[in-house]
Each structure stands twice: as C-alpha cells, then as structure tokens.
C-alpha cells in the first residue's frame, strides 16, 4: 500500500509504458477512464492501494464529456418521489463545489410559470430541494414576479400556447466542465500515487483457479502488449461494461439499456443573461435545459433508446428538430439549424429494468455487480455522484476481501488545482478556459503561445495546446480540441479549421513527422463533420 503523495506531473508516455513493463503487479486495476473509472481510481489510490487505470481511448472520450454540464440533485427525480437519490446527489454536489471550486460553481435556473398553479407547484418542490441539500446548499430558491423573471431570463417567451408568462421560480444548482473535471481527476490520481494510461485497450481478462487475476492490454498507439496482475479488477466502462463482462463469461446477459441524449450549442445571444432556463416538461415528459456555458448556450436534452453502442453516436434529425422546436416555444427568438454551432450525442448507461417502456423512467442510481470470478462491474449513476459511486465500489472490494480495509478520504480531498487559487483566476462563468487550470494558471501563462489564439470562440491558445501535451497526457488533435479545450463542442467548424496548427504543435511536443500531422488533421476533420449540421 502507498501513502498520499504531493501534487505530481504525469510522466510522459514512454515512462508510463516502461512502468507497465517493469511493474506488472497492482492492487487495483480500473478499466475505463470516464467519470466512474477516474473517480474509482482516485478513491483506491487515495486509500493507499497501488492503482492503475487503463482507458482504450482518451479520458472522458465517451459519455463523460457529453453531459449537460450540470452538477445537480435532479429536480426530475424529486418529482418522481426519489428522495434518497436527490438527497445523495445534493450532498455530493456540495462536496464537489467545495473540493473543486475552480471547476464547479453555482448557477441560477429560472423555471417559467405559464399556468396558474405552476409557480406554487414548483416553488414548494424547490423549497424541498433546498432543505434536502442541508448545510451544503448553494443558495436558496425564491419566487419571481413577471418583471423579475424577464430580468433574469430576457429571452423567455411572453406567451406559450396562448398562455401568458405569469412569473417564475429561481433555484440554484452547480455548473461545471465535464471533460475538464475528468482531466482534473486524472491529475489527482497521479497526485495521490496512482497511474493512468490512455489509449491502452483491455484485450482480455486473466484468471487463476477461476478467479479474475488481471488483464492483458495493448497500446493502441504503439501496438505493444502487457500482461498485468491485480487482486481487484474493476470494470467501469459505462455503456460498454457488458463487453468487458463477456470477456469473462461469453453468456453474460446485458445489464445496460443505453439511452442517447443530444445537445445543441447556440450563440450566447440566445441566452444573454446570467441565468439558465429549466423547462419542466417537454413533449416526451423530460425537462429541457437552456444553459449558458463557456460563452455559448447549450440546449438539451433528448432521451432515445439505442441498441448499438458507437463510441461517437450521432444526433438524429428528429432529435435536433425536437430540441429546436421545443426551444422555439419557450424563447422569444426562434433558433434554427443555421444557428447551431455544434451538436453532440452521448449514451447514458441506464441499468435495465424489466417492463419499463421508456428509458426516461429507468434508474440513474448506480449498480455494482460482482461476478463469480470476482470481476467488479459498476455502471449507472451520473457525474454528480461519481465520488459516492467510487466509494461504494472500493467498499465492495474491501467487503469481498479483495483489498485490506482502509478508510475513504475523498469527501475531504481537494481535486488537482484547487489548493491556493490565484487572485487573478478568471471569474466563474466568464467563458475563459483559464479558470479550469486553478493553481497552475501561472504554469500555463509561462508557456509560449499565450497570445496565439487558435479558436477565439473557445479561448484556445497555442499555450493551451502545449500545456495539454506536456502535463495532461494529450496525444492526439482530438484530445486537445474536444476535451482539454472544448472547441469541438462549442464551435465545430472553428475547431476543424484549427486542427492543422494543433497537429503542428503536438508534433513539435511529441516528435511526430508531417505524415502524422496530415493523418491527424484528416481524422479530426472527419470527427468534427459529425458535430456540424449540414
């Protein structure tokens, strides 16, 4: 077992691969580099276990970079009467805001009232929401009159379906950048003595006497294979958990009912105020969020069952039309396809429930399954509760005697970059990506290229690219433009235009040739085309 270490810079890839070759034995191996996997690895390493995380693509490549960017208790679950889930999520929201103030901040939401009893109905529910948050509440909810509602959300429609805007309710939840939180967790993992390797695919599970004893992995970028051992192997691969489970048991029944959620990015002019809008009930019974984020406006989401599991799901025309049409009903300015600067889709790992007709009604609570051979699988849940999910997973491993007992410390563990925030850190919600660097802001600004802006709409500079390459394990153009910076999700066309310069900088940092640059640009532009509406 290991003790907590001081903040550390991740080794370069060659050093990481050398570690796998030299040290094949681990206490814990976590498969999957999304919210759940990263959180689980941080929990394990911070308890002192020798921990390795492997990710087949890049950190947060899948669902974990495609959320609505909210750290929330779940107003919808309160309406369903799921008090325990809401209370847990609100508690975790408070912990995350405290432990990562450079990444999470309060955001006010306006709930418009167009019917006579909307305001008291939602107002009472939101007061319950406040009470459930207890001492970790971000700010109290309150009623708004007509004038206050429009002052908070100037682009709200004055009439919907012939009904006038009567007023509204204001409540607070948390906002964050999902991919940047994932990168912070990866850095935190190294800080507490763990190791993470992206582009490292699990190709098989090894067994001894019928018990899972390790994994075989292959370097996606270089081709080398490694046989690794562990007393505890954790499958945290989101909607893809069944593929790992079937490496142990080819007859294992699927446990995930994937649901696709689509979001659109619009210019900031569609939501010029500082508040978000929550539309409580759409035509399919879901809520619709209109949210300010990184100088733009996000609108979403949908809930469409899927049977296939693509790594890069694409938004269907029906989903796009549904969001635009619903937003048009509630906004004074009608958004069109021409206004959309990016569109993306993510797959939610909902746990199957027999007899449920719609994925919107399936549980977001996490599920932990231990196979006969000892493979621990965790799925379900959401970003807000990733820390509690991780605590439960490692607790399960301890209960099963896979690990010696050690206390969980993550409730009071500041994430990487949170300690000693500089006075000149950009304000929360100001749209500057520099805020996400926390106490490493001076390191970023010391790099060459701070004045070379590559994507004005996302604030990406050449210095950000160099920082990503040197300190954040970014290997490919996509890693930078999609997750170290959010250009692809904000302005896909501008991100595509910046790809050649990003490839050039990465080539300088990692020693690649012109052929590599050309291939990377082509690959990224193919990806980016799926984020644009033709």
Regions found by a protein language model. Give the residues of each.
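C-terminal accessory subdomains/tails of enzymes that are appended
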Residues: 16-25, 29, 57, 103, ...
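Dinucleotide-binding Rossmann-like beta1-alpha1 core, especially the glycine-rich loop
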Residues: 69-152, 288
